[in-house]
Amino acid sequence: MLSLNILPGADSAASAIQAEKVRMEVIAQNIANANTTKTPQGGPYQRQVVNFETIIRNEFDASNAVHEVRVAGIEKDGRPPRLVYQPGHPDADPESGMVKFPNVSVHEEMADLISSSRATEANLAIIRTARQMAMQTLAIGKG
C-alpha cells in the first residue's frame, strides 16, 4: 500500500522535540532545587533523569514504518547527596554539623541543557528540511 505521508521524518523529529521539552523541564527543576536541603518527603532533593524510548509502528512494512521518541519515565538519580560541613545550617546534623545537599551539579545540568537544546535545534532542522522537500515535490507535480 502506498503511503501518502510525505513527512515521516518530520513526525519522528516532532516526537523527539516533545521528549526533549520534558527533558528541559526536568533539568530546570533540578537547577531550581540544587540547594534544597529539605523536601516535603524529608531529606534533600534528588536529581531527576529523563529516560527515552524509541517506538516503531508498522515495523513489518519498512517503507511505512513510523519511528517515534517518547519519554519512558523520569527516575531519581541514585547518587548520594553531597555532604557539606555547615554546623549553623538549620538542616545540619546536630552531632557532625554536616548538611546533606542535593546530588545536583549545576555544571552537569547546564551541559545537559545545552545538549538538549542542540538536539531540539537538530530536530527542527529535520522538520524544515522535510517541509522543503515536500514543497519541492509538490512543485514538481504541478509543473
For each feature predicted by the language model, list its residue ranges:
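Amphipathic alpha-helical polymerization modules
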Residues: 1-143
